[in-house]
Amino acid sequence: MIDLHVHFPMRLLGGVESPRDVIKGMTRVRGREDGKLRAAVLAIAARLFNFRDWDGTWRVTPQLLEQGEVSIACSVLYRPFSEMDLDEPYGSPPESAYYPKLIELLEATEAEVARTGGVTVRTAADLDQPGQRYVHCIEGGFHLGATPEDVTANVHELADRGVLYITLAHLFWRRVAANTPALPFLPDAIYNLVFPQNKDAALSELGEAAVKAMYERKVLVDISHMRDDAIDETFALIEALDKETGRDPRAYPVIASHSGYRFGGQKYNLSDRTIVRIAVRGGVVGLIFAQHQINDGLRRTETKTLGESVAILARHIDAIGPQHVALGSDLDGFIKPTLGGIETAADLAPLAAALKSRYPAEADDILENNARRVIAARFA
């Protein structure tokens, strides 16, 4: 099984200089005086918005992934205090200092993977290594640099390090790509009022530089979190690059690593038009396990059981099409509450069994083959 979007590195954020468990190391962050405060804030946020209860712990560990029968984890690198830079006003452009911090987390993740006997994927051959495999992914274009030149150079380095995809937009506008509201505790209308974005800057100069560099090096563009106009501009740029290079569109898939079908009013989920454009390129939509997004337009109450959750996921699978759906759980991505019956990565095993029962002919595609198709295109 492949999880297209899982926050394995989140538990390492408490260790700025070295990988250490974030809960145990939260108050021992070194290097900056404000590090202790930021670590403490992250600890509280994890308990409020991520853990099942106050005394809970992380949902994704090597042991839990193994119990969940996840063979390939698309491991998402994200530095929350680069996005929510407390030293800068809202909507400020990225700073060059964010990129070294990203690399710091990447290297801490690789050390943790090696320590626990896993494999960090950097080449196509690594995908077929025995044991648990981890593929680097990045959430937030603000990590990539402060100038188009820096963004280009940094994307090239990330390609060399085996990064599968980059999600250019995220929770807050940082002048890279316009985003949609995604905070479960804040209605979309209130979010848009409190966190306004420039309506004329869907994809900025930094965003365009990122897409061009990613296209050149076959790092995939993840359109999750993007506002519809940013999605349109991203596809237009990629299609122009197809014409310029003569590349077959299916050789460069576009993905939405953690999203769903737009049944309701939330713009976070994908429109029919966007899903068709993803499908034409052979891309996939990873289904997010956040009740806030996945239930929108389908039910008003939370799912409580695995059976109820499978019924909801099936609505998305049928609407999108089983040949273009994967799992993109977003576990440990601050998505509390998660779907009923799915509390940790270990619960992916019973979910897989339920999907195999419901989709006997298509389950292997949903659980692995569709995601492997886009991963193979990246490393071809």
Question: Residue spans of the language-model regions?
Answer:
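Exposed regions on extracellular, virion, or secretory-pathway luminal proteins
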Residues: 1, 202-203, 259
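N-terminal hydrophobic targeting/anchoring segments and the immediately downstream early-domain regions
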Residues: 1-196, 209-212, 216, 238-243, ...
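Short His-Asn-centered micro-motif
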Residues: 76, 223-224, 257-258
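Loop-centered beta-sheet repeat module
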Residues: 192-235
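Histidine- and/or cysteine-centered catalytic micro-motif in compact active-site loops
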Residues: 226, 259-261, 289-291
